[in-house]
Amino acid sequence: MDIEDVMNKLSLKNKKVLNRSSEYSRLIKVKRPMGLGPLEMCKPGACIFVACKELSIELNKSQLVRVLGTNDKLFEQSILALYTILGKKRPPYSIVEISNTFKLNSTICESSENLLKLYRTKILGGIEEVQSQFTNIDDGIFSAASVYIMTQQHSINIDHTLLLSLVDCSQETFQRAMNAITQCCYQGESIVKLKKTPPKNKQNTILRSPTSILISSSSTLNNTTTSTTTTAPKSPIPIPSLTPISQIKNLTTKPIVSPSSSPLLSSISPPKVLATPTLSSSSSSSSSSSSSLSPPLSSNPTTDLSSTNEPIVFNISSELLPIPPTTTFKNDGNENKNNTKNCNIEIIEEISNVDESPFNDNSVKKIEQSNPNISNKKRSRDELEKESELGKSQPPQPQQQPQQQQQQQKEKSVKNKINEGDLTLEQERLLIKKKKEQQFNDWKNSDFAKSKPTPVNATKQLTLDSFFK
């Protein structure tokens, strides 16, 4: 669209405007032969607008933008580009022009003009010579600031970015101008702050689901094959794992552990086997019976089988015997009876070997001196009789483990599982909950949880203590 077509649509018939605008378009072609890019469609309208402003001819800006088929921002950018290419200083915008660009009411326009006049009379005593040395109130920044203050006072939202582009200033200088007007005219009561531009919505990298493309190892030169796999997003909250990492890595390369070398089986004590050997008539029989049995593994010295009739405990290794879940032993009275019978038979056999002399105390002493085992057998017989009587009076009771031992065994098994890394996620979460509850209970019972006395209560208590002394 040429300049003449735009002027015909606007019904503008002024040769001065046409000549000046055509001269500006020629200069732009000379200085910028590549054109203005996206602002090229606004070039004829910008040339007409600048020419009318220099010749002080009224022009409807909104109608001009509508004829060009653009928006206000692009049109303002094209005007700025034209002033920079021509090397001219842009004239400041008036309050009427700013209100026309934002299509504001006449009341806001009048109130903003009155506000600017009041600021001009109050600042630096209203002396124009002093004002010209420090500030330039005729600049478009103060007029734009007064318009923005009045729009905020009447709760009207306008695009402050477009306002800053009209004035061609930074956000900080515009805020300083608004603060100066409000502090002078409103006595610092109504300070209007410029709304900051919201930052661009950048997607958080943590919330993105990571995708990794893996190339398969079977890739040839002619037919390349790739396999795409997607991995699930990591949880933002890390779950604490109680299983050690060194054991998790070595799960696949674990050797086969024998039952004796494993820590779980070594912690369990092997079962105790009760052996009740029969008393023999001579020392040779006792030696043969002891040799048939396996030697004890414990380092403690063992008692002679022929000397006592009490049951002897042998510690047998876990490799020889299987580990039963529970082992209970009952003391029956029948065993004691059999033992007493054997003792009686052996004593009678030894007495028969003695000479047929009168049976006196001296003869008994001689028999005991010749065979010292007889005295021990007599003692053992008396002990067995007492035990049999106690067994009849008190029936045998099965051994029951107390609850504390059971709890300790459970805790040991859980600790072993934690050390080996055999716990599941649910079991680990339950352990974490129990630990937190225990910590809370400990804190509750401690002195930190108790309420501290306030200074008022403390003073009352001091007065009461001093009164009762």
Curated annotation (Swiss-Prot):
Alphabetical list of SUPFAM superfamilies matching this protein: Cyclin-like (SSF47954)
One annotated GO biological process: DNA replication initiation
Basic and acidic residues biased stretches: 380-390, 409-423
One Gene Ontology cellular component: nuclear origin of replication recognition complex
Top-level taxon of the source organism: Eukaryota
Cellular compartment(s): Nucleus
One of the Pfam families matching this protein, by short name: ORC6_2nd
Main location: nucleus
GO MF, one annotated term: DNA binding
Subunit structure of this chain's protein: ORC is composed of six subunits.
Protein name, UniProt field: Origin recognition complex subunit 6
